[in-house]
């Protein structure tokens, strides 16, 4: 098997509204990340963990998934060589780094490298 999918993310203009919607729709337990408008989805009972957050100002929001990689820069460069475009990052997060790229049709996909 290749690199595993390890995280999903839903970001939009109305963080509290999205949080309530997904919590009520799927019965998800959400944990707020302090002052940052982001909540993690509990995956104790199986499934892929993820998060729901506020999209940056001027960004319409997105739904994406993150794939684990060993080298974010190498993965971004490979995506670009195959017709993709760098969309964000790399950016440091607690315990690692993330980045986004757009595939040749414009779909944004995330990359995640966790610290050992």
Model-found features: residue ranges?
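A generic "binding-loop/recognition-motif" signal
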Residues: 14, 37, 72
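Vicinal oxygen chelate
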Residues: 6, 10, 76-77, 82-116
